[in-house]
């Protein structure tokens, strides 16, 4: 069976032949004993300057042998050098390709981290802007609470100018005191929340700056690695840097590098989430405080309305009684005048009767008799005196009643003035001033 042919892809290496394996020819040293020998002459012991023919052959053969050995060694060296060149070339190409691939993988990792950092920076920037907007809302809400506080304190001060007996601690004053206390508590809460917002904004900016520095380093490294990945053997920008092939003492390991990036992003995300939670808390605080203030404002307004209604009812009743009292005073004055006239009317008959009795008392002697006329005149005088005493007593009672009515009138008029003043303070001063109370949007910091 025929032997399968072998396809040669390169020239086979020459077989080396050791020097000791070459055929060696033995030569005998020729003695110069010929006819032309110089043996025995004066030159005995001295070699001639010419080589012998055998020496010439031996020398030539040695040269051939040395040339063959040198060519054989050179051929082997050329073959080994060619193999070494091919192997080192392939190794260099594989190493360069692997390095390029590793640099490419590093570029992908760097791009991934750079994108994550860019995303986190953008989110932190947006979150910081939103937090600053919330801080502005808090400041507006805090400024808006100054108006309700001034209104409540002004209402309390105005109601201090009420007169007795209306200067009472009524439910309106209780609600106003609740309102002032609520506003002070809300102001303290808003101030503390503003401080928390300021601290959170500072932390957001610090972590954003840290991410930006890391991102800037990533961009610089990405550009460096991108440039390195584009270098080829034909690039003109490459040159020798003998001392570059060493690790820097301050160089990080892949593990510490990844941990640093992960921790940096994790801290930034934690602060961003804390900022988001704080913003939600601020929304709840502003909504609750605005609703609480408006509810308390409505409670105070309702108390004012009820109190004004009470004052109106009391004022109307006082005015009704005053009208009745004035009417009664007029009637009583007419009655007093009638009594005085009646007393005056009784004076003339009394004078007549007394004059008659007086004249009849001058009757002489036995004519001074207690006759029927005398008894009738006496009874008339007694009846007139009794009538006058009754009329005068009634006049005194009427005058006392009139004085009582006058006192009642004065008291009613005073109470009406006090109620009118209280109603003016509550309705015209306080309730009109409360119309300037901020809206829910203003208290929530939107305006």
Swiss-Prot record:
Pfam families, A to Z: Tektin
PANTHER family in alphabetical order: TEKTIN, TEKTIN-4
Gene name of the record: Tekt4
Keyword Protein transport in record: no
Job of this protein: Microtubule inner protein (MIP) part of the dynein-decorated doublet microtubules (DMTs) in cilia and flagellar axoneme. Forms filamentous polymers in the walls of ciliary and flagellar microtubules. Contributes to normal sperm motility.
Source species of the chain: Mus musculus
InterPro entries for the chain: Tektin-like, Tektins
Protein's name according to its UniProt entry: Tektin-4
Coiled coil regions in record: 322-348, 375-423
């Amino acid at each position: 069976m025929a032997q399968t042919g072998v396809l040669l892809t390169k020239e086979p290496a020459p077989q080396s032949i050791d020097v000791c394996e070459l055929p060696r020819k033995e030569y005998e040293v020729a003695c110069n004993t010929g006819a032309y020998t110089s043996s025995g002459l004066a030159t005995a012991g001295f070699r001639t300057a010419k080589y012998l023919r055998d020496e010439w052959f031996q020398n030539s053969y040695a040269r051939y042998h040395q040339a063959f050995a040198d060519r054989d060694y050179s051929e082997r060296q050329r073959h080994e050098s060619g193999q070494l060149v091919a192997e080192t070339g392939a190794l260099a190409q594989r190493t360069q390709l692997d390095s390029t691939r590793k640099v490419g993988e590093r570029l992908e990792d760097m791009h991934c981290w750079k994108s994550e950092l860019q995303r986190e920076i953008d989110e932190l920037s947006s979150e910081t802007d939103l937090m600053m907007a919330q801080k502005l809302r808090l400041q507006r809400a805090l400024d808006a609470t100054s108006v309700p506080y001034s209104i409540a304190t002004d209402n309390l001060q105005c109601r201090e100018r009420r007169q007795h007996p209306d200067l009472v601690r009524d439910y309106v004053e209780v609600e106003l005191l609740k309102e002032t206390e609520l506003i002070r508590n809300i102001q303290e809460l808003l101030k503390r929340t503003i401080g928390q917002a300021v601290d959170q904004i500072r932390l957001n900016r610090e972590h954003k700056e840290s991410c930006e520095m890391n991102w800037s380093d990533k961009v610089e490294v990405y550009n460096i690695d991108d440039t390195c990945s584009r270098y080829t053997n034909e690039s003109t920008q490459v040159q020798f840097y003998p001392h570059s092939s060493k690790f820097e003492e301050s160089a990080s390991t892949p593990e510490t590098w990844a941990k640093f990036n992960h921790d940096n992003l994790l801290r930034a995300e934690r602060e961003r989430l804390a900022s988001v939670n704080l913003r939600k808390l601020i929304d709840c605080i502003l909504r609750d405080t605005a609703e609480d203030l408006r509810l308390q404002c409505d409670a105070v307004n309702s108390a004012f309305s009820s109190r004004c209604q009470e004052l109106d009812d009391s004022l109307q009743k006082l005015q009704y009684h005053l009208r009745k009292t004035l009417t009664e005073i007029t009637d009583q004055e007419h009655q007093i005048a009638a009594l005085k006239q009646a007393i005056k009317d009784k004076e003339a008959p009394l004078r007549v009767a007394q004059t008659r009795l007086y004249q009849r008392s001058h009757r002489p002697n036995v004519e001074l008799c207690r006759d029927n006329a005398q008894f009738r005149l006496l009874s008339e005088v007694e009846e007139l005196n009794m009538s006058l005493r009754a009329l005068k007593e009634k006049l005194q009672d009427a005058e006392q009643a009139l004085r009582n009515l006058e006192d009642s009138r004065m008291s009613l008029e005073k109470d009406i003035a006090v109620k009118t003043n209280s109603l003016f303070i509550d309705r015209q001063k306080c309730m009109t001033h409360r119309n300037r109370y901020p809206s829910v949007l203003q208290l929530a910091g939107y305006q």
